Structure formats: C-alpha cells, structure tokens
UniProtKB/Swiss-Prot annotation:
Segments for region (Disordered): 1-21
Protein's GO biological process: translation
Domain of life the protein comes from: Bacteria
Similarity annotation: Belongs to the bacterial ribosomal protein bL32 family.
InterPro entries registered for this protein in UniProt: Ribosomal_bL32 (IPR002677), Ribosomal_bL32_bact (IPR044957), Ribosomal_zn-bd (IPR011332)
GO cellular component: large ribosomal subunit
Protein's recorded name: Large ribosomal subunit protein bL32
HAMAP family (UniProt xref): Ribosomal_bL32
UniProt keyword terms in alphabetical order: Ribonucleoprotein, Ribosomal protein
Entry's Gene Ontology molecular function annotations: structural constituent of ribosome
Length: 70
C-alpha cells in the first residue's frame, strides 16, 4: 500500500488547497422589477427573463408559459 514518505508541510498543503476557495456569487439587477437575481436566470420575484414574462408571477416556477421569440 502506498504511504507518504515525508510529512506534507503546511505551506505545501496550503498551496494545494489554494484553488478550493469559494467565490462570491454573481448577481444582477432585474431590468423589469429591479430585484437582485442571478445572471442568465429567470427573476424569482416577477418571472421575467430577457425582457418578457416567462413564468406567471407568484407561481414560483410552476406552469411555465410558452415563450414566443420575437
């Protein structure tokens, strides 16, 4: 069975873990209602995406409308 030959130093351990940090989640302002939402996602407050209503307001994702692309 493979066993480490030497103890991993705190510096080397920290360098290995340097890419595991969590980043700040991006948010954008909804162009319809002004609430904060995630980029490229339907607004959970008003149901608009890309300037048109995709989800009926207050349905929380149930009953998606068929969006007609203009």
């Amino acid at each position: 069975m493979a066993v480490p030959k030497r103890k991993t130093t705190p510096s080397r351990r920290g360098m290995r873990r340097s890419h595991q940090a969590l980043g700040v989640e991006a948010h954008a302002e909804c162009s319809n209602c002004g609430e904060m939402k995630r980029p490229h996602h339907v607004c959970s407050h008003c149901g608009h995406y890309d300037g048109r209503e995709v989800v009926a307001a207050g349905n929380s994702g149930k009953g998606l409308k068929t969006a007609v692309r203009a």
